[in-house]
Amino acid sequence: MKKISVLLLLVLGFIFMKAQNTYFPQVFFDKKIARDMLSFGNSTIEGVASTKQKNNWGIKPVFGTKHYAPKGTVVMLFPVTPYFEEFYNMRKKYENKKTTVYMSEEAFKYKIEALTDDHGRFKFEKLKPGKYYLETIVNFTATASYQEQTGRTDTYNGMGGYMYSSPIYQTFFYGYSAANRESKFVEIKQDGELKEINL
């Protein structure tokens, strides 16, 4: 009986355990293509990294407050190779709270990094013409609110008899740390081109 109880407990544990699935692209990563795309050119991509706080439905409001990337935030630039396209499509299709899509360690090495300044600005210089993917994680302090009953008011009739009570609520605001992934594809068509973007 004891063995059955232990076995049943283990089975229930596996059923309710939140499994984390991990996927990797199955396309061959050609480091020669990636290295060639990241070799020196005369083009520049510069921009500003910012984000907006998501609402209760997980959507960033159009007219919401912008939170600029803090100084020192890393912005990564990846060359868009066939391997990267496969990675991006898999991430778009499969990634959620239980599933993560990763690049191989070797593919992740082929990128250029830039740091943001005090106003969230960044710059990538000496790029060749080609298609690139830029990504950053913008950390910010978000705000939320909740209501709490802080008292009540009693109502009496004209003769002084008690009729009913109504709660009095007060709204409290608090801040919490949040982060959003911001990304964009950028294509440089001519050598010497300057692209200005907003992430």
Residue ranges and their predicted role:
Residues M1-N21:
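Bacterial Sec-dependent N-terminal signal peptides
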